[in-house]
Amino acid sequence: MRLDKFLCETTDLTRSLAKKALHRGEVSVDGEVTKNPAVHVGEDSAVDWLGERLTPFGLRYLMMNKPLGVECTTRAGRYQTVLELIDLPKVERLHSVGRLDVDTTGLVLLTDDGQWSHRVTSPRTQRPKVYLATLAEPLQGDALTSAIATFAEGMLLDGEQKPTRPARLEALSPERFRITVTDGKYHQVRRMFAAIGNRIETLHRESIGPLVLDPDLEPGECRMLRGEEIAAF
């Protein structure tokens, strides 16, 4: 890798700022100051900028407890984005692995590993995603029995060509439910409850496949995934 590119990969320097840093003699490779941006940096090269050793950070994998009112998009818009909550270099390279809408909280995965992201979200895997929902109206008795059966059979939502895959509906109280789905249609859980004449007040994602949101993460906090968590997908 070229030295100027390596500087951009491991710092917040742009290509032009990296070349200026080189010109000022701020960078050394294997103990020798170099001003040549085309110098090759190998795996064993020791690169220092202003006396600080630079190391490539490689691929990154995070989980976040997404708060209310935050978007999973990486582009600045009306709402704050998940990337604005992350204090890492080159944060713009991260992307959300499956999104939550701005009104939904809970588990969001982020990475700069496109292949891993595809393994997590591929429809072929049918990975279960578990949500907690609070409803606007109580759901109980015969209406609950009917809803459980309807969710389990699959539903043809407005605007869709195929019905949803079988989903599990578990009542925690007349207004609070745990829902497990294995597909990822747009606003699917909200639309499923709307189809049976109810409305979701709050929606929170607990898990994706085997990965459960860390209970120690406060809304807006994130942490790196452990090796076994990454390998689970």
Say what each PLM segment does.
Residues 1-233:
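Basic, flexible Lys/Arg- and Gly-enriched helix-loop patches that mediate nucleic-acid binding at interfaces
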